[in-house]
From Swiss-Prot:
Cellular localisation: Cytoplasm
Coiled-coil zones: none
Chain spans, region Disordered: 143-163
Protein keywords: Cytoplasm, Protein biosynthesis
Name of the featured protein: Ribosome-recycling factor
Family to which this protein belongs: Belongs to the RRF family.
Keyword Cytoplasm included in the entry's annotation: yes
NCBIfam families: frr
Predominant subcellular localization, coarse grouping: cytoplasm
Protein source organism: Mycobacterium marinum (strain ATCC BAA-535 / M)
Keyword Iron listed: no
Example GO molecular function: ribosomal large subunit binding
Any GO BP annotation: translational termination
Length: 185
């Protein structure tokens, strides 16, 4: 029962770190990156579908992204979705592909993006701590119901704390890395 609670908590913490990693990938750094388009969706025959599933996305140069839709009739919809996104880029459509020039970030925009990265990191840390809290409640319930002894639960609590610190450190490292990318000129 204890192992089950710890395994469940660790699985959820891993998912929280994974979500944080995806969130960090969507923050534009001034360099072209296919991941910056992963959250943009378009209406594809009645279904909201990410652009990454409807087109190949290549980075031929440091500040240029080329998007080639698998179906030519989706070209305009993809272009419109990119233009309406919060990326701050202006796509150009040449009839077969979409080119997206990634502009240099201003100092003010860099600082805003660093704040955004720190905010997303804090959300992930809170998520990990909430998972820890729920797992601790489960461990206390196990102890109270007599399903496990004091020593076993105490050992499990130490393991849970160790895992929590490990995952929070991973999130901190993600934020630090993204901050370094953003402030690099």
């Amino acid at each position: 029962m204890i192992d089950e609670a710890l395994f469940d908590a660790e699985e959820k913490m891993e998912k929280a770190v994974s979500v944080a990693r995806e969130d960090m990938a969507t923050i534009r750094t001034g360099r072209a990156n296919p991941g910056m388009f992963s959250r943009i969706v378009i209406d594809y025959y009645g279904t909201h579908t990410p652009i990454t599933q409807l087109a190949s996305i290549n980075v031929p140069e440091a500040r240029m992204v080329v998007i080639k839709p698998y179906e030519a009739n989706q070209l305009h919809a993809i272009e419109t979705a990119i233009r309406n996104s919060d990326l701050g880029v202006n796509p150009t459509n040449d009839g077969t592909i979409i080119r997206v020039a990634v502009p240099q970030l201003t100092e003010e925009r860099r600082r805003d993006l660093v704040k955004q990265a720190k905010h997303k990191g804090e959300e992930a840390r809170v998520s990990v701590r909430n998972i820890r809290r729920k797992a601790m409640e489960e461990l206390h319930r196990i102890r109270k119901d007599g399903e496990a002894g004091e020593d076993e639960v105490a050992r499990a609590e130490k393991d849970l704390d160790k895992s929590t610190h490990q995952y929070v450190a991973q999130i901190d490292e993600l934020v630090k890395h993204k901050e370094g990318e953003l402030l690099e000129v």
